[in-house]
């Protein structure tokens, strides 16, 4: 479990995160959303130990995340970054996935097994002997995900991992993330269509926590989405248009609207 308590972070004199309090349960998937500058990526960097908070604290399994405890906690946390290119140094896919395992003194037989297991999981097992630099952006992100999964962390953070990908590559990466189980998953994204599939959505605005709630609750409030410049999933836009203009369309039956919302919501989750 991750417990964030009164977390504040300053960059120079500027507060980037302001008194955050939130809890992320084990084996849950949360999406962090908010417009640019809301503090999403800063929070991610603090969680993996790349930055230290100015005030407050983070507890991971009741252990304070600080410089002293970082060697103990770092193996529990993996992160896939926004731009996959800078993570690679001309290795083959096989070598890249094995790289972290070799640095952790894992035996050769186990390395071979894990490389195959996670390459197959992310559908790059036919590319194991290909130089990573020859891959597409989506394939590189799948290699990055396999490399993190092979380390078997308890927490994985995905920081805008589809933002540089074409629509097809983004969809493939999103589908892979949805298959990962028995871990804390944190996806930082602008894509509410994708965030809607997570267990909870955390909304940040100007460094402040606005809400932490199941997606269904968030999307029931069009005014809230409008206030924080969040676009609803495309599959729910019809519901909002009808809700906004229900008197003109002579839809008086609230239960009909609720049924429509439920149908569209289930459609979104199954996509």
From Swiss-Prot:
InterPro entries membership: AAA+_ATPase, ABC_transporter-like_ATP-bd, ABC_transporter-like_CS, ABC_transpr_CbiO/EcfA_su, ECF_ABC_transporter_ATP-bd, P-loop_NTPase
Entry keyword annotation includes Lipid biosynthesis: no
Binding site for ATP: 34-41
GO cellular component: ATP-binding cassette (ABC) transporter complex
Enzyme Commission no: 7.-.-.-
GO molecular function: ATP binding; ATP hydrolysis activity; ATPase-coupled transmembrane transporter activity
Mode of membrane association: Peripheral membrane protein
Cellular compartment(s): Cell membrane
Keyword terms: ATP-binding, Cell membrane, Membrane, Nucleotide-binding, Translocase, Transport
Domain called ABC transporter: residue spans: 2-231
Top-tier EC class: translocase
Subunit structure: Forms a stable energy-coupling factor (ECF) transporter complex composed of 2 membrane-embedded substrate-binding proteins (S component), 2 ATP-binding proteins (A component) and 2 transmembrane proteins (T component).
Physiological role: ATP-binding (A) component of a common energy-coupling factor (ECF) ABC-transporter complex. Unlike classic ABC transporters this ECF transporter provides the energy necessary to transport a number of different substrates.
Similarity comment: Belongs to the ABC transporter superfamily. Energy-coupling factor EcfA family.
Record protein name field: Energy-coupling factor transporter ATP-binding protein EcfA
Organism: Onion yellows phytoplasma (strain OY-M)
